[in-house]
């Protein structure tokens, strides 16, 4: 179905892979195969073809949006008679555990930083804004990591609010997947980037998702463009289990790893453990808190096998 023939009853324009790839226009490939190999996640096949057909058109679209935003800022400055500072453009990336949000974020960071209009692109994950393990243990929330109540939302909202307010240096806490905790005194300083990519489970959530912690503004209020990375639930579970098995042979073997004991599991035990963790924690969080936010996104990327994007929906 062509773009013109699509229903007016949906807020999204829908593109199959070939339709979306055609929108690349003449945007050059700026990444080498070696650079792409460094960007992909532990359990993903990221190819030059995927970058060319999916991410280059997306970077072109984002460059249009960012340029439009800069013109809007210039109009406001002209109206006010001021010469204000440049305010970061914020892109959020949401989706399930194991869907490949981090890879999407890293690829976009690499591509967007090569556009001459916006060289400084920072990437922050919301994992750093989880409450420390000590707090989660005190509140009985260790098995609820990633659920709304496990985040220090006041700190996260203040972080993005300060960035949008033009604060010169803003700090973000850093999370370690090795120790499964926020790194004490490990804050990262973000100094007025042109673009901030904010990646996490909760970046599309709003105040209604936090009835236990009411506040009037939320992360999504400060986001300029939002992306939801989607995939069928059966694929998500498979990817989660496969990732767990690779961690079992890799990161979990480190004696300092919080999950070091999992390295001693047999393959069958590891598969069963991962399946249980998926069902009891990650699937539950997906159904209750993440998937309901999908239609709030500016753009939805739907993946099929091998993490290949097969469909893109763009909000009109």
UniProtKB/Swiss-Prot annotation:
<keyword id="KW-0418">Kinase</keyword>
<keyword id="KW-0808">Transferase</keyword>
<dbReference type="InterPro" id="IPR006083">
    <property type="entry name" value="PRK/URK"/>
</dbReference>
<keyword id="KW-0547">Nucleotide-binding</keyword>
<keyword id="KW-0173">Coenzyme A biosynthesis</keyword>
<comment type="pathway">
    <text>Cofactor biosynthesis; coenzyme A biosynthesis; CoA from (R)-pantothenate: step 1/5.</text>
</comment>
<keyword id="KW-0067">ATP-binding</keyword>
<dbReference type="InterPro" id="IPR004566">
    <property type="entry name" value="PanK"/>
</dbReference>
<dbReference type="GO" id="GO:0005524">
    <property type="term" value="F:ATP binding"/>
</dbReference>
<dbReference type="GO" id="GO:0015937">
    <property type="term" value="P:coenzyme A biosynthetic process"/>
</dbReference>
<comment type="similarity">
    <text>Belongs to the prokaryotic pantothenate kinase family.</text>
</comment>
<dbReference type="InterPro" id="IPR027417">
    <property type="entry name" value="P-loop_NTPase"/>
</dbReference>
<keyword id="KW-0963">Cytoplasm</keyword>
<dbReference type="GO" id="GO:0005737">
    <property type="term" value="C:cytoplasm"/>
</dbReference>
<dbReference type="Pfam" id="PF00485">
    <property type="entry name" value="PRK"/>
</dbReference>
<protein>
    <recommendedName>
        <fullName>Pantothenate kinase</fullName>
        <ecNumber>2.7.1.33</ecNumber>
    </recommendedName>
</protein>
<feature type="binding site">
    <location>
        <begin position="95"/>
        <end position="102"/>
    </location>
    <ligand>
        <name>ATP</name>
    </ligand>
</feature>
<dbReference type="GO" id="GO:0004594">
    <property type="term" value="F:pantothenate kinase activity"/>
</dbReference>
């Amino acid at each position: 179905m062509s773009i013109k023939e699509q229903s007016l009853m949906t807020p999204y324009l829908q593109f199959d892979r070939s339709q979306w790839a055609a929108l690349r226009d003449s945007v050059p490939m700026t990444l080498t195969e070696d650079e792409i190999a460094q960007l992909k996640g532990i359990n993903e096949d990221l190819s030059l073809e995927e970058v060319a057909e999916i991410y280059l058109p997306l970077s072109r679209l984002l460059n249009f949006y960012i340029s439009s935003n800069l013109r809007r800022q210039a109009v406001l400055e002209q109206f006010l008679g001021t010469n204000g500072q440049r305010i970061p453009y914020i892109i959020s990336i949401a989706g399930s555990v194991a869907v490949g949000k981090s890879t999407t974020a890293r690829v976009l960071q690499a591509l967007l930083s090569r556009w001459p209009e916006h060289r400084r692109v920072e990437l922050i994950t919301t994992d750093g804004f989880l409450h420390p393990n000590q707090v989660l243990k005190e509140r009985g929330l260790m098995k609820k990591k990633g659920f709304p109540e496990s985040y220090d939302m006041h700190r996260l909202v203040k972080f993005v609010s300060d960035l949008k307010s033009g604060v010169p240096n803003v700090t973000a806490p850093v999370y370690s997947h090795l120790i499964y905790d926020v790194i004490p005194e490990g804050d990262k300083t973000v100094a007025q980037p042109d673009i901030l990519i904010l990646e996490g489970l909760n970046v599309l959530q709003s105040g209604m998702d936090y009835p236990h912690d009411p506040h009037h503004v939320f992360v999504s209020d400060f986001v300029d463009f939002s992306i939801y990375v989607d995939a069928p639930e059966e694929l998500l579970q498979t990817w989660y289990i496969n990732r767990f098995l690779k961690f079992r042979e890799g990161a979990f073997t480190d004696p300092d790893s919080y999950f070091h004991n999992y390295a001693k599991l047999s393959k069958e035990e590891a598969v069963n453990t991962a399946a249980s963790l998926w069902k009891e924690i990650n699937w539950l969080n997906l159904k209750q808190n993440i998937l309901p936010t999908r239609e709030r996104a500016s753009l939805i990327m739907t993946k099929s096998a091998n993490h290949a994007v097969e469909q893109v929906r763009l909000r009109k």
